[in-house]
Amino acid sequence: MDHRLLEIIACPVCHGKLIFDKENSELICKIDHLAYPVRDNIPVLLENEARELSLEEEK
């Protein structure tokens, strides 16, 4: 994922910063505890596409 893109996109729920999880190909919002999928190098920033992070994943 392009680091320049990460600088301009934000969580659609809280507008907070997103962190790219390369291993799982997801964008993580630590504030809302949500993971947004990245498909074919395109972030899917739809709340209904996000999954909630488990307690173990948040560490």
Swiss-Prot record:
What InterPro entries does the record tag this protein with? Trm112-like
Provide the Gene Ontology terms for cellular component.
cytosol
Q: Which Pfam families match?
A: Trm112p (PF03966)
Superkingdom of this protein's organism: Bacteria
Q: Which PANTHER family match?
A: PROTEIN PREY, MITOCHONDRIAL, ZGC:162634
Family per record: Belongs to the UPF0434 family.
Protein name per the record: UPF0434 protein PMI0721
